[in-house]
Amino acid sequence: MTKQPNAKRHTALLGGTFDPPHFGHIRPLLDVLKHWPLQDCWLLPNHIPPHKPGTHASPKARLEMIDALCREFPAFSLCDVELRRDEPSYTVNTLRQLRELYPDRVFYFVMGMDSFLSLDKWFEWQQLFELCHLVVCARPGYQLAADHGMAEVLANRQHTEADLPAEDSGKVLIADIREQDISSTDIRTALAERRDIRQLVPESVARVIETQGLYR
């Protein structure tokens, strides 16, 4: 059995609009949970995403979709700290709040390679390494070139062991996972065109979308 490096709980975090949540979110997280001995995963829906113009479904509808998803997949839990804000959801502020609320946890913020490549444009991005570890998942069409600015960050911080880091923050873990070429935009387009989406979203999410007539 892979040992835990300390007595704290190790929790994966995935933020996003989840508009709607889909297998492109879920399958990489399930792979991450299989690869490392993380004990749970929290989904963090944004209220006001800082890098997007807004959302299509209401906060209430997105909350219901995520709540249904978490009932279908018990490894996931809803964390609504960002959804309750009336200001842009900057990741660094969320992590500061979570570290204060849950000092007994070590957080692993999960992102795609596309997000990691632009991490140096995030608000106070360097402070993230004081607050959490990063788990970077492959995304179709995105590779980290040797001369990219984030290559040095990865070289200095990459954790390559099978066990979790002994530190509470500061490492980058590269997840060798199944790439998922699924986007919320594609799903909304399919719904608007009355096409079937059940290969793209969990059954629980599809039921909420159908019951509420979302994205029509």
UniProtKB/Swiss-Prot annotation:
What InterPro entries does the annotation carry? Cyt_trans-like (IPR004821), NadD/NMNAT (IPR005248), Rossmann-like_a/b/a_fold (IPR014729)
Example of a GO biological process term: NAD biosynthetic process
Name the keywords, alphabetized: ATP-binding, NAD, Nucleotide-binding, Nucleotidyltransferase, Pyridine nucleotide biosynthesis, Transferase
What Enzyme Commission number(s) does the record list for this chain?
2.7.7.18
Catalytic activity of the protein: nicotinate beta-D-ribonucleotide + ATP + H(+) = deamido-NAD(+) + diphosphate
Per UniProt, the enzyme's principal EC class comes to: transferase
The molecular function terms of the Gene Ontology recorded here are: ATP binding; nicotinate-nucleotide adenylyltransferase activity
Q: In which pathway does it act?
A: Cofactor biosynthesis; NAD(+) biosynthesis; deamido-NAD(+) from nicotinate D-ribonucleotide: step 1/1
UniProt keyword annotation of Phosphoprotein present = no
Q: Which HAMAP family match?
A: NaMN_adenylyltr
Q: Which family does it belong to?
A: Belongs to the NadD family.
Q: What job does the chain carry out?
A: Catalyzes the reversible adenylation of nicotinate mononucleotide (NaMN) to nicotinic acid adenine dinucleotide (NaAD).
What name has this protein been given in UniProt?
Answer: Probable nicotinate-nucleotide adenylyltransferase
> What organism is recorded for this protein?
Shewanella amazonensis (strain ATCC BAA-1098 / SB2B)
Q: Which gene encodes it?
A: nadD
